[in-house]
């Protein structure tokens, strides 16, 4: 009996929600824009989107520079050891170099991780 009452209450609630009118928004003035104003507004949105995209690319390139400088510093440290030749010939370092040549911004972190992993292999 309790399940029946609960099911009926849920059906009634969904029926009320479906039949209700949508609430009016506070941005009613947007509905009254002319076509010219609409185009200007869309142009501004497009410019803002382009600006945000350029910021994202800048952040990626800045991150790339950080990771590459860390990788170079780490590489200089481990290069002093004679065992480095074995690490540099290993497959993961070759793959990291290939990734870097293919897409330096996206895969700089992978290069950094590869060099860091090489240092861990050498020095434990």
From Swiss-Prot:
Record propeptide residues = 20-62
Q: Which stretch is the leader sequence?
A: 1-19
**What keywords are annotated for this sequence in UniProt?**
Amidation, Antibiotic, Antimicrobial, Secreted, Signal, Toxin
GO terms, biological process: defense response to bacterium
Anything noted about its domains? The mature peptide may form alpha-helices which disrupt target cell membranes.
Q: Where is this protein localized, as stated in its record?
A: Secreted
GO CC terms for this protein?
extracellular region
- Phenylalanine amide modification sites are 123
User: From what organism does this protein derive?
Assistant: Lachesana tarabaevi (Spider)
Q: What is this protein called?
A: Cytoinsectotoxin-4
Task: Please give the family membership noted in the entry.
Answer: Belongs to the cationic peptide 06 (cytoinsectotoxin) family.
What this chain does, per the entry, is described as: Insecticidal and antimicrobial peptide. Has insecticidal activity against larvae of flesh fly S.carnaria. Has antibacterial activity against Gram-positive bacterium B.subtilis B-501 (MIC=2.5 uM) and Gram-negative bacterium E.coli DH5alpha (MIC=10 uM).
Top-rank taxon, per record: Eukaryota
The main location class comes to secreted
Query: What GO MF terms are annotated?
Result: toxin activity
Quick check: keyword Signal in the entry?
A: yes
Tissue localization of expression is: Expressed by the venom gland.
């Amino acid at each position: 009996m309790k399940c029946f009452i609960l099911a009926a209450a849920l059906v009634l609630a969904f029926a009320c929600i479906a039949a209700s009118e949508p609430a009016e928004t506070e941005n009613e003035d947007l509905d009254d824009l002319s076509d010219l104003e609409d185009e200007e507004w869309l142009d501004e949105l497009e410019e803002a989107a382009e600006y945000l995209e350029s910021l994202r690319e800048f952040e990626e390139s800045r991150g790339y520079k950080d990771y590459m400088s860390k990788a170079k510093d780490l590489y200089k440290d481990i290069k002093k050891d004679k065992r480095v030749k074995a690490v540099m010939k290993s497959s993961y370092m070759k793959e990291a170099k290939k990734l870097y040549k293919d897409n330096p911004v996206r895969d700089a972190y992978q290069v950094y991780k590869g060099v860091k992993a090489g240092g861990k292999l050498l020095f434990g």
